[in-house]
């Protein structure tokens, strides 16, 4: 009897255990279904965010995509190759993650974005001297005899080439370079440094860095403009460039001329009121209406012409000379193209004119 009871007891235990297992299995299956639905919904939301990033640069919840890339639910990068059109109309496939960029004469802007090129522009053995500390270890490519051959460029293994002027792309060079790596061409990057920095930042996934750099420069220029205005007023400022081939008065549309006359709002001579530059000679010099003059000995190669002009009685009789308001500009960066150079120029102008 006791044995039969024990057998019955064990039988009930087996039945109860089986029932419990069924309940547990059903619960687990239900939970897994909920988890799958939840993960699918989360994946859909993340996919929507990534699409928003690719098309607008921002995610749907209002958070900015700093480098115009997204992340999936595992936190890995979702960068993808994209196609853009350069300023000459070429369709250019930009790599998902640019590692090795070659952008001769745009080293200033590259460094401002925190990017080192695989090689740098040089005239003979001299690159942009004011950038050499930051470009330490970056090989020089001599452009004095023309652009580097495709074979020479291939040795640096660039995955993106950026040409700062359309003249660099002429005579079949673009077609040759484009076979090495995707090649983006500006019409004239130096003509609008702010615009070209913005584009370069976008190409390299550094859009937010470019935006911050531009805001910082605008703030610096605005503060300098206020200081200069109280001293200079409506007087004119001139930039005279001495070079082996001649002497010229720089206008306000590019390089240091843009900084002085556009960013700092300083008046310019009527000789360059509508021109990018004007030739200067001893005969024309008396027409120069400027109370402040900055002198540039271009790459230290205009010494002979500088001496010829500045030792003449006509020069010595000019108001700016008599008043001690002629300043020698640093030719390393006054002919530079980029915010690093522009910031240095702003500092020079404020220090020279205001003494601050």
Regions found by a protein language model. Name each.
Residues 157-163, 182, 290-293:
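Proline-aspartate-enriched helix->loop->beta-strand connector
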Residues 27-31:
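C-terminal motif of bacterial Sec signal peptides marking the signal peptidase cleavage site
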Residues 125-130, 249-278:
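Alpha-helical, coiled-coil/dimerization segments enriched in small aliphatic residues
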Residues 76, 176-243, 339-356:
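Extracytoplasmic substrate-binding proteins
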Residues 2-21, 32-106, 209-237, 302-305, ...:
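Bacterial Sec-exported substrate-binding components of ABC uptake systems
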Residues 126-128, 168-172, 188-199, 203, ...:
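Extracytoplasmic ligand-binding site segments that recognize negatively charged/polar headgroups
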Residues 102-152, 166:
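A short, structured surface patch at a secondary-structure boundary
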Residues 291-356:
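Structured C-terminal subdomain patch of bacterial secreted/periplasmic proteins
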């Amino acid at each position: 009897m006791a044995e039969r009871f024990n057998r019955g007891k064990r039988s009930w235990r087996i039945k109860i255990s089986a029932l419990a297992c069924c309940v547990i299995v059903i619960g687990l299956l239900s939970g897994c279904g909920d988890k799958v639905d939840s993960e699918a919904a989360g994946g859909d939301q993340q996919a929507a965010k990534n699409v928003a990033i690719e098309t607008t640069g921002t995610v749907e919840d209002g958070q900015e995509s700093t480098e115009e890339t997204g992340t999936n639910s595992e936190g890995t990068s979702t960068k993808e190759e994209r196609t853009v059109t350069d300023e000459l109309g070429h369709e250019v496939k930009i790599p998902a993650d640019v590692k090795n960029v070659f952008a001769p004469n745009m080293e200033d802007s590259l460094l401002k974005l925190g990017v080192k090129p695989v090689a740098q522009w040089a005239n003979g053995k001299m690159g942009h001297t004011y950038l050499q500390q930051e470009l330490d270890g970056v090989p020089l490519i001599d452009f004095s005899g023309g652009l580097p051959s495709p074979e020479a460029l291939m040795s640096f293994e660039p995955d993106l080439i950026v040409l700062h002027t359309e003249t660099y792309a002429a005579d079949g060079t673009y077609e040759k370079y484009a076979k090495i790596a995707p090649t983006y061409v500006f019409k004239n990057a130096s003509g609008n440094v702010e615009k070209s920095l913005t584009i370069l930042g976008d190409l390299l996934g550094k859009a937010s860095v470019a935006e911050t750099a531009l805001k910082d420069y605008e703030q610096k220029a605005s503060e300098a403009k206020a200081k200069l205005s109280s001293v200079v007023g409506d007087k004119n400022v001139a930039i005279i460039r001495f070079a082996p081939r001649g002497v010229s008065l720089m206008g306000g549309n590019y390089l240091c001329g843009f900084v002085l006359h556009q960013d700092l709002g300083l008046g310019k001579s009527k000789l360059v009121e509508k021109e990018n530059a004007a030739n200067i000679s001893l005969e024309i010099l008396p027409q120069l209406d400027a109370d402040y003059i900055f002198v540039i000995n271009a790459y230290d190669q205009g010494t002979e012409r500088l001496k010829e002009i500045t030792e003449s009685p006509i020069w010595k009789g000019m108001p700016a000379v008599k008043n001690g308001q002629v300043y020698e500009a640093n030719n390393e960066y006054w002919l530079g193209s980029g915010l690093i150079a522009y910031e240095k120029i702003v500092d020079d102008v404020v220090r020279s004119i205001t003494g601050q």
